[in-house]
Regions:
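Extracytoplasmic metal-acquisition and chelation regions
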Residues: 5, 15, 19-221
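Sec-dependent signal peptide recognition
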Residues: 2-10
Length: 221
């Protein structure tokens, strides 16, 4: 049913796109649509004043269970760039990519080229999902400052490749933000390495990368 619904939504999006007026060139800035908040934050920090960056999945909405509306797909199609983290997180992205014209909107996968850890099944920690969430690969990369840097670098490099005339701005912005993430990484390393207790308990097994990078042990309940 989801597939049929998305086909209907895609057709509606085409109609909305045909009727709407794109704002891509009104202020001379790029229009970038991002999926959920970490991707939005990283992209906004890199793009700076060169782009209008839009957040698709609003705060309080479960990313896994989110389904794009016709208007959402139209927003993606009308954008210059669409940025997402990983299809194991935004499970709906593949169907969206099939429904849009990727010759007109650049798609950036922030985890491109990264080696991901095996995923896990979660059956009890999301009451709104009957079957829980199952990830072939763990997508929660951004929760480790050390790996968040790689996401920022991928977004930076992808934007530079597409818009080389804005290279200096993207690289300068990214460097400033990476410096902050480096400082956070150092603080995590120094503080957590001194911790006597290395185990922590969590209901949502999303911290495997953080645990691996800082010598901790995640225990799921």
């Amino acid at each position: 049913m989801k597939k049929v619904g998305l086909i209907f939504v895609s057709i509606s999006a085409l109609l909305l796109g045909a009727c709407g007026n794109s704002t891509a060139s009104e202020d001379g800035k790029l229009n970038i649509v991002t999926t959920f908040y970490p991707v939005y934050e990283f992209t906004k920090q890199v793009a700076g004043d060169e782009a209008n960056v839009d957040l698709l999945v609003k705060a309080g909405t479960e990313v896994h269970d989110y389904e794009p509306s016709a208007r959402d797909i139209a927003r993606i199609q009308e954008a210059d760039v669409f940025v997402y983290e990983n299809e194991n997180m935004e499970t709906w992205v593949h169907d969206v990519e099939e429904s849009i014209d990727t010759s007109k909107v650049s798609v950036i996968r922030a985890t491109e080229g990264m080696l991901l850890l095996p995923g896990s099944e979660e059956g009890d920690d999301h009451d709104q999902s009957e079957e829980g969430h199952s990830h072939p690969y763990d997508p929660h990369v951004w929760l480790s400052p050390a790996r968040a840097i790689t996401l920022v670098e991928t977004i930076r490099d992808s934007l530079v490749a597409k818009y080389p005339e804005k290279k200096d701005t993207f690289e300068t912005n990214a460097a400033a933000y990476i410096e902050k993430l480096d400082a956070l990484d150092t603080k995590y390393s120094e503080t957590l390495s001194a911790a006597k207790q290395k185990y922590f308990v969590t209901q949502h097994t999303a911290f495997a990368y953080l645990a691996l990078d800082y010598g901790l042990r995640q225990v799921s309940i």
